[in-house]
Amino acid sequence: LWIASYNNGVTLYNYSTQQSVVTYKTDSEVLPLPSNTIRTILKDRENNLWVGTAEGLVVLNGKERFTSSPIFRKFSFATHQNNLLFQDNIVHIREAKNGDIWVGTLDNGLYYLKRNPSTNDWNYQWINVQKGLSNNCIKAISEDNNSFIWVATNKGLNRIDPQTLSVKIYQLNDGLANNEFSERAYIE
């Protein structure tokens, strides 16, 4: 069981022994995190652990997690104004049914990560207000039965077509009770 904390990093807990196996924090010698404030975690279909912190996104390689030297990978591709995703305040990580990853930030919009099957690298698209999103403060990410991605923000609900990355915004005039959503407050 992976346990995320608000100020104490992320801990792997063993049910059988009822003890913590390892805790990763900013001061860890082997695998320091960019921040001890963990906002969200996701275990994907390949057993990788995605850790969204207040200062960036890291991924713990699931295949090598229990060896003597686990591997954290920082995402560091360039975005706008020389900022990097690994410095963003990550608030939600979502794996789509097809294995793509959607990463929501507190004030920098949304990142769509798609694995390139030939290189195994992650390609990304940055979706923000300039690309049609209602607001850059992401509150929640969900996927419907038609594979549309629904993104709740501070200023409305957005439906994204993952094929074209086109965005349709829903707000008060579309029947919403409020334009501002709570963080990760949804049921599927």
What are these regions (language model features)?
Residues L1-E188:
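Carboxylate-rich, polar loop motifs that coordinate divalent cations or form catalytic acidic clusters
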